[in-house]
Amino acid sequence: MGITYLHISVATTALSFVGLQVWTELSLDRLRADGIITKNISLGNSENTLELLLSSHTTIALLASFVLNIYILLVLSLKTLFFGDLYAIETRKLVERLANYIIYKGTFLPFVVPRTVFQGVLWTIWLTVLCTLKMFQALARDRLDRLNASPSSTPWTYFRVYSALFMVLSTDLCWIKLSLMIYNTVGSSVYLLLLFEPCGIAFETLQALLIHGFQLLDMWINHLAVKNSDCQRSKFYDSMTAGSLLEWKGLLNRNLGFFLDMATLVMALGHYLHIWWLHGMAFHLVDAVLFLNIRALLSSILKRIKGYIKLRVALGALHAALLDATSEELRDYDDECAICREPMAKAKRLHCNHLFHLGCLRSWLDQGLNEVYSCPTCRKPLFVGRTESEANPSRGEVSSDEHLARQFERQNNSVHALTTGMFPTETPNFTESDPWRNSEVDPSWLQTWSDQGVDVVGSSAGSRSVGLGQVQLMMRHLASVGEGSAQTTLDDASWGLWPMNPSQASTSSTYVPPGAGGRTGGLHLRTVSRAANNMASILAMAETVREVLPHVPDEIIFQDLQRTNSVSVTVNNLLQM
């Protein structure tokens, strides 16, 4: 095992302690030799002896070095306990956040704090403690996001990092109590600054505990579900319990998360306003910087409130416009949401009989390109026969979600006048709905959607190759590939995001001669095998790429697929353009 920073910190801490002890003994011997103190130090003269020792600059330097080494050792020990080794990107973000926090929070203190030794030591300790708590909190959130995106993370690994948030919260609450004691003892308004930032960190930590606590609970439930194999009825009730938990998770994350977010912003605003009140209005550069910070915080608060109101209105409009799925439909389909891959206790039913969570469906509809809204599973258009003015309305004060709700309501009313319904139940003809399929291509070349694992009607669980959850996993995978070394096609296929075509498998195992592959203009090129020239494979892979990147022109997708013959490599290349 190599030497780490923790081992070096232990050694330097031991050396500083030995140095401080040796210097203290030498100083006491010198004071005894001069007759300033007696040989036996009692409780009565201990205060005088301590003052004599601290009068030496060497003693103060050694004591400060020992305290600093103790602090570094404690931080490194906690880092090793909760996080282990840090990734390079985590270290870089940590340094950037630390510098920004010191600049934004510590720069204004000299303008309002009295310039004495006691005040300097007190506010230095305050800033150091808050920086430590803030960095551990940010590091825990980043690592939890990384574990949430990793398919190999376990509940124990997640809980190990999650417990760091409990450590931050408990330490922060103790620091708030200590700050209140100092403020009540001294009574000066300057010491009120001790409270704003710790309260803001507490609210941020509570929000992180709320969000990632549900993630940990979901991971633990899924881990137990993999181990236990019960009967179909028990499986249904378990899915209903998980679906109810998901509904509560969305409700709490939306409402309580908004409250905690607003409380954090209000604490930051109060911190800057109190500094401005203590400093006074002098029209200096400091006042201009404070004004800009306050203006940015006020803008963030107003934007957050408007966003929350719009979200509530949008969810209410969609909830009233879409039909609720009955418990019989949920039991018959034994379904999970094709967007978030979670069970459903409550669901909304589209006209094609596919079921989704309300929030997931809204997120999907928000990504509609040029307002061409379709079912996430079967790609049937949600609105048929719209005029051009309806397809591109002048928005004004009407939000896109209200516009969607009106279209759903108009379609629901028109369904009662039709005998066969708005959407037929037979398999849709994708060669007619997609404009890029109108070229003169032999219909026998085209692979059906059933070969790609996509169900047409009924259960949406069959469409695991499409849907927002798989697209997010693909993006996370590409991000991890970008940070590390280049992966092969077999590594890409091991994720199981899309079914691997035989042509792709043959391409992965094809020998690449020297100079045939490589990079050209920043794009990853793969040798195209003879079997990859099959138009059916190209069309099937193009469909998959269009699920991830619907805004990319079809010609560019075809050109890159002809070079790479790989869905993952093509998506990676198009993202680099």
Swiss-Prot record:
Induction info: Repressed upon infection with the P.syringae avirulent DC3000 strain containing avrRpm1 (at protein level).
Reaction catalyzed: S-ubiquitinyl-[E2 ubiquitin-conjugating enzyme]-L-cysteine + [acceptor protein]-L-lysine = [E2 ubiquitin-conjugating enzyme]-L-cysteine + N(6)-ubiquitinyl-[acceptor protein]-L-lysine
Domain CUE: 537-577
Subcellular location: Membrane
Major localization class: membrane
Residues spanning the membrane: 3-23, 58-78, 120-140, 162-182, 191-211, 272-292
Phenotype of gene-disrupted mutants: No visible phenotype.
EC nos: 2.3.2.27
Class of enzymatic activity (EC top level): transferase
Membrane topology: Multi-pass membrane protein
Xref: Pfam families: CUE, zf-RING_2
Pathway: Protein modification; protein ubiquitination
Any GO molecular function: ubiquitin binding
GO cellular component: plasma membrane
Keywords: Hypersensitive response, Membrane, Metal-binding, Plant defense, Transferase, Transmembrane, Transmembrane helix, Ubl conjugation pathway, Zinc, Zinc-finger
Listed InterPro entries: CUE (IPR003892), RIN3_plant_CUE (IPR035667), Znf_RING (IPR001841), Znf_RING/FYVE/PHD (IPR013083)
Keyword Metal-binding carried by entry: yes
Superkingdom of origin: Eukaryota
Matches recorded under SMART domains: CUE, RING
GO BP field: plant-type hypersensitive response; protein ubiquitination
ZnF RING-type: positions: 337-379
General function of this protein: E3 ubiquitin protein ligase that acts as a positive regulator of RPM1- and RPS2-dependent hypersensitive response (HR), in association with RIN2. Probably not required for RPM1 degradation during HR.
Subunit structure and binding partners: Interacts (via C-terminus) with RPM1 (via N-terminus).
Name the record gives this protein: E3 ubiquitin protein ligase RIN3
Organism: Arabidopsis thaliana (Mouse-ear cress)
Gene (name only): RIN3
